[in-house]
Amino acid sequence: MLNHGIFTFSNDAKESYDLMIKYVSDAEKAIKKLKRRKIKQIKNLNTKITPAQIAPILRGLTSNSTKSKFILTFRNNKILKYFIDGKEVSRYSTEGTATPDHVIRVKPFPLIIKPKPRSSISEFEKTAKKAFINYRKKYLHYFEQNQKKVKEKKTILDTSPRVIIVQNICLLYTSDAADE
């Protein structure tokens, strides 16, 4: 549970503290043994599309399913580019949530848009629309499956993504509040 820590319990404080030291030390040793895996990258798509061109399209598609008007925050740096341009981004970007807040704030999976090489902006818009339709269906299915697991009725708030990965271009975070 990222940023939530670990918990150790015992009948006395000293024993609980010693268990904490042991488990943290064990985790450090395990992490050191892990091999860094290289992420195989997609080929450069030679796209001339920029984040500034796609932002209005994505904002419109995001706000389509709700009364809220979403704010898009553009994110891009060397590490993020490496992450979003991985051939298996669809797999590793959905390998579980880091915290309960993660599920609440960013939903269980991102929207991944894979533009075709040398797409025009109108071709990108068609690709994005299809991706949004599929995302909303997938999210609705996820919500309905999880609703079956609980007794109390839940209300779906909206089906729009919070994280949008546009391969070879950028990552965007969507929110209806500027401070999120």
Positions of predicted regions on the chain:
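C-terminal regulatory/interaction regions
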Residues: 167-168, 175
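Contiguous mid-protein beta-loop-alpha structural module that forms a pocket-lining wall or clamp
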Residues: 1-38
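A C-terminal functional module that forms or caps the active site or interfaces directly
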Residues: 104, 135-136, 140-142, 146
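Hard-cation-handling environments
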Residues: 31-119
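A structural signal for short secondary-structure junctions
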Residues: 96-98, 155-159, 164-167
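Non-transmembrane, aqueous-exposed alpha-helical and coiled segments at domain scale
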Residues: 147-150, 156-158, 170
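Conserved small/polar residues in nucleotide/adenosyl-binding loops
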Residues: 173-180
